[in-house]
């Protein structure tokens, strides 16, 4: 699988290194993404590329290879869905580590001070969830389509995909 994995690892590492450089260039104590576009870009490099990789690996099965082009329409969104949910779920831990994946456009909209992220009002918490959940739900819908395209007789692969999907959906 090296011929599948290696170029995608390079793509992912290259994208993540750009984000690391953006943080290094920032003078802020907490590095924050500017907008939803930057968040989607980040999610692509850390998770969307994994969706591409898994599809290429899964497609080594003759049963799945027949659906490959249709799966490829949804594979990036699979990763984005899971990562968006992680961003929503883990934002306080991320901020403690000096990263804020909740875009500046969202924190400004709800007058959120990153230094007091642990003391958000219910309205501020709901605002974060609402603004990030809209794209996340779209990505989750696409993920469900991806799973439905997997042949029924590929039960292990289907379960491999269903379990994180259900966990993300239930979060």
Regions found by a protein language model. Name each.
Residues 146-159:
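Short, solvent-exposed helix-loop connector elements
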């Amino acid at each position: 699988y090296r011929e599948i994995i290696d170029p995608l690892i390079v793509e992912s590492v290259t994208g993540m290194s750009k984000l690391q450089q953006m943080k290094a260039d920032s003078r802020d104590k907490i590095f924050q993404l500017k907008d939803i576009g930057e968040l989607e870009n980040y999610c692509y490099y850390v998770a969307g590329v994994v969706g591409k990789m898994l599809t290429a690996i899964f497609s080594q099965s003759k049963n799945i290879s027949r659906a490959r082009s249709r799966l490829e329409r949804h594979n990036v969104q699979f990763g984005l869905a899971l990562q968006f949910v992680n961003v929503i779920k883990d934002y306080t831990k991320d901020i403690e580590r000096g990263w804020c994946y909740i875009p500046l456009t969202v924190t400004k909209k709800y007058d959120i001070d990153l230094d007091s992220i642990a003391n958000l009002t219910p309205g501020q918490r709901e605002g974060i969830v609402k603004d990030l959940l809209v794209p996340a739900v779209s990505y989750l819908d696409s993920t469900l389509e991806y799973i439905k395209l997997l042949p029924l007789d590929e039960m292990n692969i289907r379960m491999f995909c269903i379990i994180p999907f259900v966990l993300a959906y239930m979060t």
